[in-house]
Amino acid sequence: QAGLILSRYGGPGSHRYPIGFSGDTIVTWESLAFQPYFTSTASNIGYTWWSHDIGGHMRGYYDEDLALRWLQFGVFSPINRLHSSCNAFNSKEPWFYSPETCRLMKQYLRLRHSLLPYLYTMNVATHEEGLPLVQPLYYHYPNQEDAYEAKNQYFFGSELMVAPITEALDPVFHSASVSVWFPDGVWYDFFHDWKYEGRGKLTVFRTSQDIPVFARAGAIIPMDAQPQTGVDLPEMLDWHLFPGDNRSFVLVEGEGDNRVETRLTVNWDERKIRLDLTGDLALLPEKRQHRFLLHTFETDPIIVGNQSQEIAMGELQSHPIAKEDRMFELLKSANLAYDRKNELFAACSTAKDWKQLMKIITPLEEGLRQRLFEVIYSSEENEDL
């Protein structure tokens, strides 16, 4: 509950203690499109607590799509701060917008609060190790040109990679795009478990409900299972576990010498989870529980008590991502002729392999072709695709 200062930027040196912000932003898509780059590169001079006026500060125009996309980016920013001028028509409260936009805004604000265990741990790493929460990709891939070209893409802590949507929804397909560079390895869509092989750039598409957030293979993300408006430590922690590499994550709670560290070690080869607690356990809720969510698998969550222990994952059955279902949803919401939708879906769903699928989608117009290609790419296991 330490105090914080929000300050204007006063040149190098002024960044060491306060929260900064990117100035009085104009309410436009162009202004939003600059913010992810501005936020991630602030880390280059150690300005790790960098913020922006979510939704834009002044002027501009009323645009619910813009307001929602800015808020989604704000949830995956160092500081989540809605703000505007005193113009009564420029309010940023969720209930100022339509019921559906309001619902999505509230959903994302709750997501932000559920991320507090992860965010707090990452900010401890900033304080003690100088590691920013938001990092440009070239911090990890300094010798790859693609890392410098992906200006609006960044790492959000040690486990997640984010590529905010900064353009309006397409009126035909009701989704918006962003070009994403996937580094080597496997990446999973955090919300849907779609699998992306890291081998280059791909245009990805998301409806208003989603922002592109990707978990690296083996990612471990601790979250509050029952987020409230207070600052009490969670009664139950959700550990989101993504398959792949054997890795560990150390969750930090409390501060200074008066803190608890919970180390979670996941061994996918042996199907084991190791939970180790050190520090002043009296800081934690008396009935603390841990719930393990094994992404991409058809298995019930594993729930255990708050003591050091080893947990067996048991038999794991992969949860298939049905590309036909995704294609159907894509076509269902598109403003295209019914007969064309029906013919295209029939052809795609009866294709024998990805090569046949590519023959079907290659002649299509760009917007439709790219959307279908993403579905195929993130649903198939074929390394030749």
Cite the ranges covered by each PLM segment.
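Catalytic-domain carbohydrate-binding cleft regions of carbohydrate-active enzymes
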Residues: 1-210, 353, 372, 381-385
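Hydrophobic residues embedded in beta-strands of well-ordered beta-sheets
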Residues: 160-161, 271-275, 309
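Solvent-exposed beta-hairpin/edge-strand motifs
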Residues: 180-192, 291-307
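Solvent-exposed, conformationally flexible loop/turn segments
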Residues: 199-200, 208, 305-316
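Accessory, solvent-exposed terminal regions and/or long lumenal/extracellular loops of proteins
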Residues: 211-303, 315-385
